[in-house]
Curated annotation (Swiss-Prot):
Tissue: Expressed only in developing endosperms. Not detected in roots, stems or leaves.
Primary role: Seed storage protein. Might be integrated via inter-chain disulfide bonds within the glutenin polymer.
Record's signal peptide: 1-18
Glycoprotein is among the record's keywords: no
Lineage: Eukaryota, Viridiplantae, Streptophyta, Embryophyta, Tracheophyta
Keyword Disulfide bond: yes
Protein name, entry field: Avenin-like b5
Spans traversing the lipid bilayer: none
Pfam families: Gliadin
Length: 284
């Protein structure tokens, strides 16, 4: 549900920020030629946002240099599908379905890995999987989840297919908890979650009147990392790719961070920006 709310907010924001195409198209040549110390500090402070917007599991696709329709990331899609499918399985056979997921993942490992401490690894993997699905989906699963009944082959296959999104999500790089099969797993947030948290935290620490400038810095930094031939000539006024990158940056950060950003975000200027404490630690 949260995924759809974010998507709805993003689509709603599209209309509200249409006027950015004019106001955000100016000042990039000036930004390129002259950077104040405060601007450089803002860019450094927004590094987590740069990292997040370029991650594969970003919540919205950020097509710098290309005009594309906003869409949910593959991680969010499979997460939603996983929870939706799990909710449709009766409580009394959810344990069996989760056992099938564990088995399906373990079968994809090499023969040698499956032979080493298979029973212990499966038990630990089962525990981690239960914790992950419970936290992620908020769906009841028994704490002592044991395979309680034998099902027919057709039922087992149906359950396994029904929870395919869960298997996909748990093996994805941006899964909420790392579940290594069959090694001993360790709880840890993914890099995507860390940089998203850092990005929002850093953005919230920047005064409102300077957030437009900071977001311009993010878009500029990303654009400068593209191959020279892709962004050559981008600094001419009214370039569609330039406008689209700013518009998408504003839209994604507004939806993701729930932080006030002006609808008409002005172009960057060369004014001095006061020093802002930079957060350098990891996610809380």
């Amino acid at each position: 549900m949260k995924v759809f709310i974010l998507a709805l907010l993003a689509l709603t924001a599209t209309t509200a920020i249409a006027q950015l195409e004019t106001t955000c198209s100016q000042g990039f040549r000036q930004y390129q030629q002259q950077q104040q110390p405060g601007q450089r500090q803002l860019l450094e402070q927004m590094r987590p946002c740069v990292a997040f917007l370029q991650q594969q599991c970003r919540p919205l696709r950020m097509p710098f240099l290309q005009t594309q329709v906003e869409q949910l990331s593959s991680c969010q899609i499979v997460q939603y599908q996983c929870c939706q499918q799990l909710a449709q399985i009766p409580e009394q056979i959810r344990c069996h379905a989760i056992h099938n997921v564990v088995e399906a993942i373990m079968q994809q490992q090499s023969q040698q890995q499956r032979q080493e401490r298979q029973q212990q690894a499966q038990h630990k993997s089962m525990r981690m999987l239960l914790e992950t699905l419970y936290l992620m989906c908020n769906i009841y699963v028994p704490i002592q989840c044991q395979q309680q009944q034998q099902l027919g082959q057709q039922q087992q296959q149906q359950l396994q297919e029904q929870l395919t999104p869960c298997a996909t999500f748990l093996q994805h790089q941006c899964s909420p908890v790392t579940v290594p099969f069959p090694q001993i797993p360790v709880d840890q947030p993914t890099s995507c979650q860390n940089v998203q948290h850092q990005c929002c935290r850093q953005l919230s620490q920047i005064p409102e009147q300077f957030r437009c400038q900071a977001i311009h810095n993010v878009a500029e930094a990303i654009r400068q990392q593209q191959p020279q031939q892709q962004w050559q000539g981008m600094y001419q006024p009214q370039q569609p790719a330039q406008l689209e990158s700013i518009r998408m940056s504003l839209q994604a950060l507004r939806s993701m961070c729930s932080i006030y950003i002006p609808v008409q975000c002005p172009a960057p200027t060369a004014y001095n920006i006061p020093m802002v404490a930079t957060y350098t630690g990891g996610a809380c």
